[in-house]
Amino acid sequence: MSRADDAARALHEHRRAKTDPLLDEAVKPQDLDEAYAAHLALLELMTADGGGPQIGWKVGFTNDKAQARNGATEPVFAGLLGGNSYVGEAELTSPRGTGLGVEAELALRMAQPLSGPVSRQDAAAAIDAVAIAMEVVEQRVRVDEMGLVTMIADGTQQYGSVIGEWNESIDPLTLDQCDVRLQVDGLTDGFMPATEVLGHPLNALTWLSEALGRYDLALAPGDVVLTGAIVPAQHLNPGQMAELASDGLGDIRLWVD
């Protein structure tokens, strides 16, 4: 077994035991390549454990502040699993009773395969629908304790997703003109433009295509891509509700128990 496989098994056990995902030096990934290899192995373990199938990918750290805060020099990616993806609304229980985070994002649905370096126009042509989405995140341990490579291996705090109704009429090239409004318990916590995501949400997709190509992976028709936080993560305590809305894309909701 490789170090990446050992790291994946250890992280999987931490998830099942609901313990902090801290790794011994003997199995901790040594670089980004090992971190992503461990994450891909973890996705296989989680799928076999009933969490799958994989339905796509998320892109994270899509602005300079997020990258600086987490010690990264570029965005990151992680897999999305169908077992914790919901349509329109969801009611989720906080695993540790401390609440969950929610990020306001856009979701893209792929119509064509995509891999390696591509232009924004190529990326737009490969998309057949757009939706608003929430990425649900769980910060199980502080970033400075975990470290970037372990965070990537563990899925970059990914806990689940809520995806709105797919809109097939929007031109993906115009997504930089989209605004979203995130409310928590009826109070607006953020109203932000999609340009918060690398200047244009499609830049997240072009980055992801190139990054996946480094590991001989590709986006496939039907894959869902979360493009990164437009409104930064807002914490929801048990009993709170978040609502995300955008003109032309409808609204979605999340309750935390």
Language-model segments: residues:
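Short strand-turn-strand beta-turns centered on an Asx-Gly dipeptide
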Residues: 184-185, 227, 247
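Short, charged beta-turn/beta-strand-edge "cap" motif at the junction between a beta-strand
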Residues: 230-234, 248-251
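Catalytic-core "active-site belt" of small-molecule-metabolizing enzymes
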Residues: 2-200, 237, 241, 251-257
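A conserved acidic, glycine/proline-rich C-terminal tail/linker
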Residues: 204-233
